């Protein structure tokens, strides 16, 4: 409970100030970004946190989660509102699968969109996707943010 307290108190305060219908939160269970290890009880932490946040009636919960389908299903069962789900590294042929299955109301594609400035055109034309380069994330320069090629660049 103590590990979840800040997130719950912050979400509660924001919802009270601007309205729960204008408040959302993003969680990244099982993220190992920058060597984070949330410990053996992290699944229980997220179950508790999502159940508490659900009671606030927030606009949506945004989960970024690469694996552990059982945990995703558990969190979905605890969250009655809108769910935005991001699956980093998800293959293109699985885009839309979480919506089609009813697991999520919306899917997000952060890293894929970042690496493909013409993302919509690539989807519409079934064009190839640029792979994202995580080594450029948060690097302090424009490398990795504005230098990915478009389909037109590749054709030239």
Regions found by a protein language model. Give the residues of each.
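Flavin-dependent oxidoreductase catalytic cores
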Residues: 1-156
């Amino acid at each position: 409970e103590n590990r979840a307290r800040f997130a719950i108190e912050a979400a509660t305060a924001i919802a009270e100030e601007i309205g729960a219908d204008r408040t959302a939160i993003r969680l990244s269970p099982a993220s190992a970004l920058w060597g984070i290890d949330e410990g053996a009880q992290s699944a229980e932490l997220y179950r508790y946190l999502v159940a508490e946040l659900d009671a606030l009636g927030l606009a949506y919960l945004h989960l970024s989660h690469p694996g552990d389908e059982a945990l995703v299903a558990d969190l979905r069962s605890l969250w009655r509102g809108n769910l935005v789900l991001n699956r980093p590294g998800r293959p293109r042929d699985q885009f839309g699968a979480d919506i089609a299955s009813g697991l999520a109301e919306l899917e997000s594609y952060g890293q894929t969109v970042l690496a493909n400035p013409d993302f919509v055109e690539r989807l519409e034309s079934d064009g190839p996707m640029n792979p994202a380069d995580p080594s450029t994330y948060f690097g302090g320069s424009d490398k990795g943010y504005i230098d990915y090629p478009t389909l037109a660049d590749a054709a030239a």
